[in-house]
């Protein structure tokens, strides 16, 4: 370790971890041969608290309770309290069922796979990923749009099991307790209300192919992936205890639900509902299996997904929280990038609301926040390594609206009114 400071109290002291001087931090704590600043202490405490919370959930005998699962989900996903409760209960019951499967019971507990329904960018994928991290089981994601029936060009459904096996480092026992998330499940809906006359290998055909592995079967998986060959050796993976979570935006499903609710009323006395009166997420909460069938999912496939969790639209306040509060919040990520150049980054409150409003107008949910931030900071990040004497970059509402450039605050102007 290089010497951060000499024994002379008049010399400038530096944090041994981040390298900041005593003038750049609020407190500098001295040890026998090292110094640590208050910012590094705070960062260490955050890491310890996070590790302690995850360890607490994992170390308890049996399975984490739904409340414990929700508490950890709250650190990563903003809002969606109803969906969190549904998922927490379903996951808790699933792994409780596995832990008690060896005991002799007259009642056999069935597996409850989960369907996540919600507008794009509301956190469906993040919820599934975080659940797998909490339970500490192998996790894999698949895109339903790439799947086809066996024998056709495309990805075989059994390749999903192979991906899970790879995530478990080819430990079959661990893979058989894992979680599979299938995204864009609404894109494999049947193309018409009538049963297919011609073969629908990427829609109804994929639903049929998924039935067995979702319910429980012994899948023969080629270790190297790809198509099966008669001379090949296969790994046998039982999918009975693998939890399948399927997610999709189901664009247009709200119209099917609304039409069912309104019935067939016509005439002067009929109530004409304003489509803006109720938000999409609110309407989706009333989804029933018949609505999914009308959308294009076959009854057998719907039956394999008994637990349905619906996600709400994200309003402006929720999007602002997503920008700043989660562990991996976008603002924190960009602040870390700027810190690498020893420059601070500040977003004013009105700037954050401006970013949120843009995302709502684009109808991209939380997923669109990053592209908006990237556009705002592009020129600044291009010049960032060349800045000399700049101590802080401030983004306000005018910058978000494209009417101004970010404010640059220089070190020598820190004492007075900062301007650029």
Swiss-Prot record:
ATP binds at residues 119-126. Pfam families: AAA_2, ClpB_D2-small, zf-C4_ClpX. PANTHER family: ATP-DEPENDENT CLP PROTEASE ATP-BINDING SUBUNIT CLPX-LIKE, MITOCHONDRIAL (PTHR48102:SF7), ATP-DEPENDENT CLP PROTEASE ATP-BINDING SUBUNIT CLPX-LIKE, MITOCHONDRIAL-RELATED (PTHR48102). Component of the ClpX-ClpP complex. Forms a hexameric ring that, in the presence of ATP, binds to fourteen ClpP subunits assembled into a disk-like structure with a central cavity, resembling the structure of eukaryotic proteasomes. This is ATP-dependent Clp protease ATP-binding subunit ClpX. ATP-dependent specificity component of the Clp protease. It directs the protease to specific substrates. Can perform chaperone functions in the absence of ClpP. Residues 3-56 form the ClpX-type ZB domain. One of its GO terms (cellular component) is HslUV protease complex. One of its GO terms (biological process) is cell division. The keyword Zinc applies. It comes from Caulobacter sp. (strain K31). GO terms for molecular function: ATP binding; ATP hydrolysis activity; ATP-dependent protein folding chaperone; protein dimerization activity; unfolded protein binding; zinc ion binding. Zn(2+) binds at residues 15, 18, 37, 40. InterPro entries: AAA+_ATPase, ATP-dep_Clp_protease_ClpX, ATPase_AAA_core, Clp_ATPase_C, Clp_protease_ATP-bd_su_ClpX, ClpX_bact, P-loop_NTPase, Znf_CppX_C4. Disulfide bonds: none annotated. Keywords: ATP-binding, Chaperone, Metal-binding, Nucleotide-binding, Zinc. Belongs to the ClpX chaperone family.
């Amino acid at each position: 370790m290089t010497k951060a400071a000499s024994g002379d109290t008049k010399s400038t002291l530096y944090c041994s971890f981040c390298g900041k001087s005593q003038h750049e931090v609020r407190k500098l704590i001295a040890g026998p041969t090292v110094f640590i600043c208050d910012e590094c202490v705070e960062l260490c405490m955050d890491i310890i608290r996070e590790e302690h919370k995850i360890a607490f959930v994992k170390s308890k005998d049996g399975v984490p309770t739904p409340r414990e699962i929700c508490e950890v989900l709250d650190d990563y996903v903003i809002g969606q309290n109803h969906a969190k409760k549904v998922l927490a209960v379903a996951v808790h019951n699933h792994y409780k069922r596995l832990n008690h499967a060896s005991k002799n019971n007259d009642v056999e507990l069935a597996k409850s796979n989960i369907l996540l329904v919600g507008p794009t960018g509301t956190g469906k994928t993040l919820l599934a990923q975080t659940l797998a991290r909490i339970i500490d089981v192998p996790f894999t994601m698949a895109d339903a749009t790439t799947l086809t029936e066996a024998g056709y060009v495309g990805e075989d459904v059994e390749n999903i099991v192979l991906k899970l096996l790879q995530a478990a480092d080819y430990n079959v026992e661990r893979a058989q307790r894992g979680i599979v998330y299938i995204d864009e499940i609404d894109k494999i809906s049947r193309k018409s209300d009538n049963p297919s006359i011609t073969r629908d290998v990427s829609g109804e055909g994929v639903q049929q192919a998924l039935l067995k592995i979702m319910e429980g079967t012994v899948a023969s998986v080629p270790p190297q992936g790809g198509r099966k060959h008669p001379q090949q050796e296969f790994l046998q993976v039982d999918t009975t205890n693998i939890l399948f979570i399927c997610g999709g935006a189901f664009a247009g499903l709200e119209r099917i639900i609304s039409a069912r609710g309104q019935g067939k009323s016509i005439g002067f006395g009929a109530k004409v509902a304003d489509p803006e009166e109720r938000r999409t997420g609110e309407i989706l909460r009333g989804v029933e299996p018949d609505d999914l069938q009308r959308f294009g999912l076959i009854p057998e496939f719907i039956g394999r997904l008994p637990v349905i969790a619906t996600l709400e639209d994200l309003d402006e306040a929720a999007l602002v929280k997503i920008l700043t509060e989660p562990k991996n919040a976008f603002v924190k990520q960009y602040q870390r990038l700027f810190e690498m150049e020893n420059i601070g980054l500040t977003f004013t409150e009105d700037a954050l609301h401006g970013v949120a409003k843009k995302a709502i107008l684009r109808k991209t949910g939380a997923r669109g926040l990053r592209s908006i931030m990237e556009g705002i900071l592009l020129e600044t990040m291009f010049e960032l390594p060349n800045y000399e004497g700049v101590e802080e970059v401030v983004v306000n509402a005018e910058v978000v609206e494209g009417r101004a450039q970010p404010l640059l605050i220089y070190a020598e102007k820190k004492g007075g009114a900062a301007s650029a």
